[in-house]
């Protein structure tokens, strides 16, 4: 992906970070003790970036943070390493501060939009209980990983008297497997290869933990363990190459894991979600053969799924190349949950006559979806609360592709009414609301937490 750059000079070339945060503190409204500040760094060196992202966040608070959310792009792996990056953060961050985070495609905050660098959210509030948790081997055993993560969080909430509760989890997203004799890539053509590849992807995912992320299964289990809690789930990723991703937990770095933070407070916590997509055609495409629990679609209307899909949207086979997953961002398939919520699902890989999603389709009726740039912009804006003190959200990395430079227009619009905010770009988005009682997973969707 082409790196997003701000129209002004890069942040590390400006001497504005300290003055920006100081100015905001001076004219900030009375928050009755709740403070939230966003940190930022675009330094290339991992350790220096870690220090700067922590420093710029903490300078926005008048008290030490009660928790710290940390996100970075994948490039620090080759510029000092993620352990050095984390060490740089802890050079500055007060000892014992709960910290979770991981690698993401990019982020949007009050400084701009970026696909290289690091950003963080530091929060301080006295009337709030905080607990963090972790679970491992999410691709091999998502249920066990979710159980362990939820158990870690809940054990610290036994004595909490606050009613408002929220969990944010970051789960290791999909990675591209490598099969000897097949290579690796988004397109595997040929009947023999594709039939074998469908089976190999499931085996690779469950045994080698290279393949489909199974984040939707993690969310489903978490929602059962915490049925009265609002949950927001994002998928960790690299720069959309689907090679690797990492999760941060205090001072350590993991992969194939779920890291989560739970909050209980007397503050109202609102969770909104939405996307700008609608049906292109009312007629559903009927799934007649599938595998891997609905993650691999083999046949639609009793014919090869790929052929039926490209026929429906009037594409030629020439469109089926290594950039297919990006092309289908504009025309994803989708299905409806029991409450009629429409879930966009971008095609992940072509497996001969079939294709894969990055999560399970919960219905055998698929619809071709479409959206305009304006409807996507409106969907992001609609998730934001104008009078929020703390704003943290996730947005699909596909929005970076579909919107292009218009993503700056989104950032500028939000900045008109929010002084500090952080939105990370992820590979998949999930939400659970106790009022709906349905764990939902999506692509190309926005989910935003607002605390007033």
Could you say what each language-model-derived stretch is?
Residues 2-452:
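Hydrophobic alpha/beta core scaffold segments
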